[in-house]
Amino acid sequence: EGTGKATINITGGHIGIDGTDGGVVYGSARGEADDRYVMAHHAFVKESEVNVKYPTTADVADISDTSVGCITGAVHGSGENGYGYGDTHVTLHKGLIGHSLYGAGKGIGKYKKSIPILAGDNKGTLKEREIYGLLSGKVLGNTYVTMNDGLVVRNVYGGGNMTTRSEERRVGKECRS
């Protein structure tokens, strides 16, 4: 326990600058990728809800105009390397998202670990490798993505960007026009 629900309501403003790294909205915490057997503390929330409801949907041609309300990057229901312990709810009521819409988070964090070589002349020799964090951006509950109106320039995903899963989960997706 000890964690609550994170709720984000976006109703105006310009988030990010087109053509740069940034402009991304995350529904939960930013965590640290590390070996799950070594690192006992990860950043997470119990449940997250992200609502994007601009008054109007901007035109894609205006995405670099900072006076126009939009999100230039992606929207994630969970965190960047942090994870959601329960469910995520992501709803696009109206507005422009310049990248993709994800029900879960982004698992881009890596850590280094020495792993034995399994075959060949160097069998048993340890080699250092970069490994993506097992819980990075993951949602342990269900993801719910609803798009009532608006524009997503790239894709809509029920899951996350480079996240993992340890068991089969039901992903609820709903798209209305």
What are these regions (language model features)?
Residues R169-S177:
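A short, hydrophobic C-terminal helix/tail in secreted or cell-surface proteins
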Residues E1-N155, N161-S166, R170:
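Surface-exposed loop/turn motifs in large extracellular/passenger domains
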